[in-house]
């Protein structure tokens, strides 16, 4: 189900708010304080696209809802005593009721067609990263984090696998976090006691992906990790010496090119 809320609602909402405030039969309207707030909120609920649509319009006075229209009910209903004369008045006006009942099509289904391409059909692929919370040590408690970020829509499935088998115990999730830019993120953590040679995999399924994304993390001993770091350090050091050597070589070449043979006129 999809819910779209529009603060302020349709032109019909604005018209009825004006009628509600100015209509003499409503004694409470004449006694309103100098400063008050009237809000109308229109909500469209969609199931299976536009197969089933429900329209709800809420009228709020100073943060308290007092009357609403629900398309499933087909008429206005008072929420508080303040809304009772309003509901009775509007339900007695055939034109207003017919327009509200038609709003499911003229407002909800219409707007769905306008915004469907960049809301309902919008797809953004997630970025997946796996990392431990502590410096890796075998046979000690650790926490693996699978960070899934920047995806839309919010429906997503994240699983942890150990050596190809799904892990369910020790899995903790933050739940969906809104990034504020129409994308989401989620952190799914797995409690582990890593053993040498074990492979942990974070598997992500999302509507934007044609196939699941998997990111692996391998448990390594301290010696293996030290060897890997030494290898990386040696590689970087080798690149540094190569860069220095090339710099000296090209500088010397430039110096030789500036010399001229003896006796050559310039």
From Swiss-Prot:
Pfam families documented for this protein: C1-set (PF07654), MHC_II_beta (PF00969)
Organism ancestry: Eukaryota, Metazoa, Chordata, Craniata, Vertebrata
Domain of life: Eukaryota
Renumbered residue ranges of the record's region Beta-2: 125-227
Signal peptide (UniProt feature, chain positions): 1-29
Keyword flag Transferase: no
InterPro entries: Ig-like_dom, Ig-like_dom_sf, Ig-like_fold, Ig/MHC_CS, Ig_C1-set, MHC/Immunoglobulin, MHC_I/II-like_Ag-recog, MHC_II_a/b_N
Topology class, membrane: Single-pass type I membrane protein
Chain positions carrying an annotated carbohydrate: 48
Residue ranges that the UniProt entry lists as topological domain Extracellular: 30-227
Annotated compartments: Membrane
Cysteine disulfide partners in this protein: 44-108, 146-202
The family this protein is said to belong to: Belongs to the MHC class II family.
Stretches that traverse the bilayer: 228-250
Record GO terms (molecular function): MHC class II protein complex binding; peptide antigen binding
Regions of this protein lying in the Cytoplasmic compartment: 251-266
GO CC aspect terms: late endosome membrane; lysosomal membrane; MHC class II protein complex
Record's keyword annotation contains Transmembrane: yes
Segments forming domain Ig-like C1-type: 126-214
Protein name in the entry: DLA class II histocompatibility antigen, DR-1 beta chain
Keywords of this entry: Adaptive immunity, Disulfide bond, Glycoprotein, Immunity, Membrane, MHC II, Signal, Transmembrane, Transmembrane helix
Annotated stretches, region: Beta-1: 30-124
GO BP term, pick one: adaptive immune response
């Amino acid at each position: 189900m999809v819910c779209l809320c529009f603060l302020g609602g349709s032109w019909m909402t604005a018209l009825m708010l004006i009628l509600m405030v100015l209509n003499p039969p409503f004694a409470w309207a004449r006694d309103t304080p100098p400063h008050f707030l009237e809000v109308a909120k229109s909500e469209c609920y969609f199931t299976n696209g536009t197969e089933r649509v429900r329209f709800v319009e809420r009228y709020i006075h100073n943060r308290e809802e007092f009357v609403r229209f629900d398309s499933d009910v087909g008429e206005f209903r008072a929420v508080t005593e303040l809304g009772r004369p309003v509901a009775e008045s509007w339900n007695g006006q055939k034109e207003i009721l017919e327009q509200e009942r038609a709003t499911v099509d003229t407002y909800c289904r219409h707007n769905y067609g306008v915004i469907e391409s960049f809301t309902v059909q919008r797809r953004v692929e997630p970025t997946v990263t796996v990392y431990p919370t502590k410096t890796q040590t075998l046979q000690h408690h650790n926490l693996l984090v699978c960070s899934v970020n920047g995806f839309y829509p919010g429906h997503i499935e994240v699983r942890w696998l150990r050596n190809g088998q799904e892990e369910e115990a020790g899995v903790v999730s933050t739940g969906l976090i809104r990034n504020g830019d129409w994308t989401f993120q989620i952190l799914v953590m797995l409690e582990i006691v890593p053993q040498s040679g074990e492979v942990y995999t974070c598997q992500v399924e999302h509507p934007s992906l044609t196939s699941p994304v998997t990111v692996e993390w391998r448990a390594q001993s301290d010696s293996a990790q030290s060897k890997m770091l030494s290898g990386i350090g040696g590689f970087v050091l080798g690149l540094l010496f190569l860069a220095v050597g090339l710099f000296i070589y090209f500088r010397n070449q430039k110096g030789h090119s500036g010399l001229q043979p003896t006796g050559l006129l310039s």
